Structures are given as C-alpha cells and as structure tokens.
Amino acid sequence: MLSEQAVGLGTGWEPMNTQLDAAELQSERGTREEGSWRTAPRPLEHLHCGLEDEPLSLQEKATSVPWVPAVPQEGNTGDWEMAAALLAAGSQGLVTIKDVSLCFSQEEWRSLDPSQTDFYGEYVMQENCGIVVSLRFPIPKLDMLSQQEGGEDQWAPDPQDVEGRDILKVTYTGDGGEPQGDTPELQVEPPRTLSSVTEDTALWNPGQGPSWESMPRNSTGMLLSPRFLQEDTFSRHLHRTDTDSLLKPHTCPQCGKQFVWGSHLARHQQTHTGERPYSCLKCEKSFGRRHHLIRHQKTHLHDKPSRCSECGKSFRCSSHLASHQRVHADSKSCKGQDFGESPAAQHCVPPVPKCHVCTECGKSFGRRHHLVRHWLTHTGEKPFHCPRCEKSFGRKHHLDRHLLTHQGQSPGSSWDRRTAAF
C-alpha cells in the first residue's frame, strides 16, 4: 500500500539538488499558467497543521525534510512523477507519512485526481470540518463534507455502511512523549448522522428491502410518509377488496342480483317465496311490504260501517244510509204505478221522502232545516233582529229586505231586480 512508502532523507539529498532546481523552474512556469504549484518552495509546514504544537520528536522528523512540493495540477503527469521521485528517493533516515498530519484546503483537494486522493486520503485530517476521516470511510465522501460548508444539502452516511462499525479517532495525550505502544489510543464513538436527518426519518437503501417502484404510495402516486406507514389504517390501504363486492356485498342465491344492504336482499327474497308477512288485524289482508300495510290501515280510519242491503253501498253515517234507502223505496212505488205508454211514464221521478215530521202539526219535511224553520212558526220566535230599528224577523231574507229600507232604497224594486235576475 502507498501508505507504507517512505520519504528518503540524509544521504539521498545531494542527488536531489538538480531535481529541486527543476522543481523551482516548474513552479515559476506554473504560476504564469495559473496552475496549482506554489510560487516558492516552502518547508514541510505547508503539509502539516500546527507543527509547533506537535511533540518534539515529530518536529525533528519533520525538519529533517527540507520541503515537499505542493500537489501538482491535474493532468501534469511530469510534475506528479517528480514529486513521487522525491518521496521515494533514499533509503536512510526514513520518515513515514503517518508521522506527519497532512492538511489540504477544499480547493486543493478538489484539484486532485483520483490517484492522488487515494494516496493522501487515508491520512488527511480536515480540521476545519471538525471530522476525522476514518479508514472506514472512503475519501470521495469529502466532497459531501465540502457541500456542507458551502450551504448545500447536508449529507448523512449510509446506515448500512455505518452499522456495526466504530469510528476510529486518534487522541494525543499532550505529555510530549510518543504514544504508548505501536498503536495509538483509540476513542470509540457511536455512528452519528448530521443534524438534518431527524429521528423519525427513514433512510432507505435499495439493498435493504423492496425496490423503489414497489414502495407504498397514495392515490396520487406520491410515496407515503413514515408517519403514515405507522398508522393502523395503512393495512386497509394496502388490502382493498374489489369495488363491486365492496359496494354490493349481498347477493341473491337464486337470481344472482346484488344488494347493498341485507334488508334489501331479504325483501327481494320474498318475491321468490311469495311470503306476505304483514297482515291487517281488521280485515285480515296481508302485504309483502310494511308501507303497503300502513297505507291500507289508513282506509280503516274512514270506515263506512253502514252498508245498504240492496245495492251493497257503504256509508260513513247511518243518516246517509237512510237517505239512500228512500231512493230504493220510491223507485219501487214508481214501478208499482201504471203510467201506460206515455212519455211521462218513462221519466217517472220518485218523490222526495219526507222523514222529518213536525210533532205539533204532523207535517213532514224532506230536509231538517225545513223542519227547523217550520218549528219557528209554532213557537213565534223571530231570531233575526234589525240593528237599527229593533225589528225582528223569522227568516233571514226577510231581514235583508228590511235593511234596504234604511239605505233609502225601495225594498220592492230591489227585490224585483233580484228575482228578475233569476
């Protein structure tokens, strides 16, 4: 692995002078071309962060290397080969790249090609982001971290990659000595997501479950939210029965008709059986539907118990039946008379029966109000009084004729005009 390569120092420095001069010429020419080379060679402090604060042993190792050129621009293969030669030269006074903390800005890191990011990526500490790049996370995800500072959408690591892993972080004790043992002290931190990922957000991975097309959606085609997925009614949205069976679940076994309500099916089955469960208590008639029985019972409220024995007609009042029976009696008397062949005999009209008899004189009348008016002649009562002259009359039309005299009219003339109109 490239991380195990060492930078040669000491005895290999003299042969490198010619290469350093060439590197200076390349840097001046790169400045004019707006490249990524530095204008002047700098010591190793360009590639480490806060070397003054590092332990003395690290400073000694770092100062033993005069300078390391900055990362070449993309596409300058010659510059990259020169930098690789400087790093690989010599075999004495080796200083591994693990002993030096490398720091790149975002612009410098973006200018690297994939081979350069693979080389530096495992050892770069990007302190301005506050995140130590672990060996567990691939370096290309630093592009995601740069988007966070630029105000773009925040990024959360894939939970499948983070699951079951611990983030390794090197901590320095600050006592000025080397870390104990061959391996540095490890601080185990649980995997965390960025602040933009809330607790109730579901991170979906294609390898974890069904495909994207098979995810549950609503009627408009939009994906259902996690909160809706937790509702009890979600099962009803996934398991919907057929529309026809849902609207009309009741089916007649004989004719196959479907009904919405069970009561409608029961009423329909009566047409097959001919059953009439609703019976009238008065006339013992039966009906198949209840509202038919109610309509029939209304006829009993206006019963006509009086029935004519000759023609079968019914009457509500017995007096009406009596008046009707007189018609049959008069017709019989009319048939008993022999009118011959005259036309008058063919139009024989029976006289009106007079059933209302006066108890004083024995006169009979066909109408009751005629009897009442006749009764006034026996009692002498005059119930109709004039409001102006206090005269009284036994009949109302007599009073009306008298009132005309108070209006300055001749009662005879007005009476004649009224009779002439008829």
Swiss-Prot record:
Classify the source by domain of life: Eukaryota
Q: Which InterPro entries match?
A: KRAB, KRAB_dom_sf, Znf_C2H2_sf, Znf_C2H2_type
* Major location (coarse): nucleus
Question: Known Pfam families for this protein?
Answer: KRAB (PF01352), zf-C2H2 (PF00096)
Q: Residue positions of the PTM Phosphoserine? A: 410
Q: Which UniProt keywords apply?
A: DNA-binding, Metal-binding, Nucleus, Phosphoprotein, Repeat, Transcription, Transcription regulation, Zinc, Zinc-finger
Q: Name one GO molecular function term.
A: zinc ion binding
Q: Where are the zinc fingers (C2H2-type)?
A: 250-272, 278-300, 306-328, 356-378, 384-406
| Location in or out of the cell | Nucleus
Recorded protein name is Zinc finger protein 641
The organism is Mus musculus (Mouse)
What gene does the UniProt entry assign to this protein? Znf641
